[in-house]
Amino acid sequence: MQGNALTVLLSGKKYLLLQGPMGPFFSDVAEWLESLGRNAVNVVFNGGDRFYCRHRHYLAYYQTPKEFPGWLRDLHRQYDFDTILCFGDCRPLHKEAKRWAKSKGIRFLAFEEGYLRPQFITVEEGGVNAYSSLPRDPDFYRKLPDMPAPHVENLTPSTMKRIGHAMWYYLIGWHYRHEFPRYRHHKSFSPWYEARCWVRAYWRKQLYKVTQRKVLPRLMNELDQRYYLAVLQVYNDSQIRNHSNYNDVRDYINEVMYSFSRKAPKESYLVIKHHPMDRGHRLYRPLIKRLSKEYGLGERVIYVHDLPMPELLRHAKAVVTINSTAGISALIHNKPLKVMGNALYDIKGLTYQGHLHQFW
């Protein structure tokens, strides 16, 4: 963690930790805070949360999100916490906590998967993503002095460990669901549904290794700098629900394909990149095939899975996204970028500010 972020995080004395990512991360954060002389209490909202906090002192919340501010008020009278921590600021319970904390002058810090990936975790006071307090004024960044590149500790992510934590979280959460009858998860909370999706994701990945083995060489050679890359996000991404005008990823696909068919150069192609975490949940091939026919695009639209994002960006002419962090990667690759939702990096001078029709 960089020094200034660490200073902000540790400037409190008494911490209340709400829901973290699936796994022991927030339990570990609480223990780390205590090792540095702070007080830290975890709040659990379902059986999965409780399982990963089982070795700690925790408080359980059994009521609805609307009743959460009152619960926080009563708790604050007993445990005078000055800082609330959570993972993601768009979950219903976290939204209520954020509003309440702001009204009481209590610090609200949200963790998020890193804006820069891999190797980074994001934590910001007040909110993350489009709620970030990072300035949108380009002059602010132009006036910043050159800084040395930060030291980055190389961490190797473990897919199996992540799957294991998710499996236990869902199974135990489902098993004890009757103890938390008012809890509503921000995503599907059925371990059986998620297990089916994971199995489907696995065999689809193996299938795509065969069916799409010739796609990347074609993009790198024949279509180099001749295609626009449209990045998809997971179907239930809170960034779409809260920070865009789209109700569904399919609406975004439709708008991009329609605009491309009307205004893009006839010799150009559109590559639509499926999100790898959505592989087992959604498949947009029938929609893309239908829209290609409806908009007269023929074979100019290429739908891809699991191809390496750096290579796709390197050989793309330009990039379109709703508000994915892949947009930051596009900027790093010095690609023209159109943001269709609200994003912290959608800044004049960095991204295209005009209409999508003119972007092509």
Predicted regions and their residues:
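A donor-sugar binding/catalytic signature common to diverse glycosyltransferases
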Residues: 84-93, 305-351
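Structural motif
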Residues: 14, 82-83, 226-227, 269, ...
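N-terminal subdomain of nucleotide-sugar transferases
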Residues: 1-46
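Conserved catalytic-core segment of nucleotide-activated headgroup transferases in glycan assembly
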Residues: 36, 181-286
